[in-house]
Amino acid sequence: MLRIATCQMTSGPDTAANLQTAEMLIRRAAREGANLVVLPELFSLVTGSSEEVLKNAETYQDGPIQSVMSALARSLGIWIAAGTLPLKSPEPNHVTNSLLVYDAFGQEAARYDKVHLFSYEGTNERYDESELYTPGHKPVSFTIPLDNGTDVRVGLAVCYDLRFPQLFRLQSG
């Protein structure tokens, strides 16, 4: 049986504190029997400063956040869908908003870069994720083998992606 835990946390600009909270929640979920733990979007860093995001972006497959998530998955023997974190993008002054999945051996099982970036323009305010984030370009799913010999396929999406059913149609095909 697949037991999924979703972790709700209030992240801020202190990556170390965010990682400490995430680790505590992951360990609690594992103790309670979860074999897949899902962290929220931007679990590692929430700040209003694009400069801080760019400064703290990790190189893909090389960074402290990725190392911690991999080590936790391995030591606890569980799968972790690491929320999203900013990864360096080839596009100048941009990052990807990336969800990384680690298997129970700590190996990366999937990478999904958020495809649908949110934007809003109101009377007195404006927000556009594309000013900082490079969008992903493809649907991603992964398979978790269960103890009974069956597999469960899991499709990945982040926040605003939920408004686009075509993403899920592509994942199911």
Residue ranges and their predicted role:
Residues 1-5:
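Extreme N-terminal starter segment of soluble prokaryotic enzymes
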Residues 7, 37, 155-157:
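Hydrophobic positions in the central parallel beta-sheet of the AAA+
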Residues 8-13:
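Short polar catalytic/cofactor-binding loops
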Residues 15, 24-105, 111-113, 119-120:
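Cys-nucleophile CN-hydrolase/nitrilase-fold catalytic domain and related Cys-dependent amidase chemistry
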Residues 17-28, 164-169:
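Short, acidic/polar
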Residues 18-19, 62, 160:
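A conditional alpha-helix N-cap/helix-loop micro-motif detector
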Residues 58, 90-173:
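Active-site catalytic loop in hydrolytic enzyme cores
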